[in-house]
Amino acid sequence: MADQDRVEILSDRELGRTLVRLATQVLEQVDDTRRLMLLGIPTRGVELSRVLARELERMCGHPIAQGSIDPTFHRDDLERIGTRLAQTTTLPCNLEDRQVLLVDDVIFTGRTVRAAMEALHGWGRAQRVMLLVMVDRGHRELPIQPDFCGRTVPSRRSETIELRLRDVDGEEGVFLKRPIPPK
């Protein structure tokens, strides 16, 4: 029996179709895919960027630069969310004249993306920075919007949205998790 607090938003099949659609939209907006760099935001954004890079490589026929950017030390809300172990920032090449696509699983308040953009500026000046998210759940505290979005899912602040990827979790899909009320 499935957990009663977990609701499927995207099945593994729907997630696959959504990834293909997002990859297609990215290809339509990027001038030169050889200048494209995907940077995942920990934790699930890193794996999502790997999956997206593979799909883009399949579509355009050449490797896509892919890495990660850790925003931990640029956050303005560490005292509220608690400190986390910093992840390694991995840039596959210089940012200069690159079209950078920041990739995250879920956008919520916008604070993680703001911190990631601040961290990115410490590494150089990209030609263009775009944002791709699998799910936009609303509740923005900053004026940050994704350029590419897989699904918009209205949610309560008390709920969470979880992207599950086969390589990491053994299953694929997007799930809304509701807190179980006390008995």
Regions found by a protein language model. Name each.
Residues 1-183:
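PRPP-associated nucleotide enzymes
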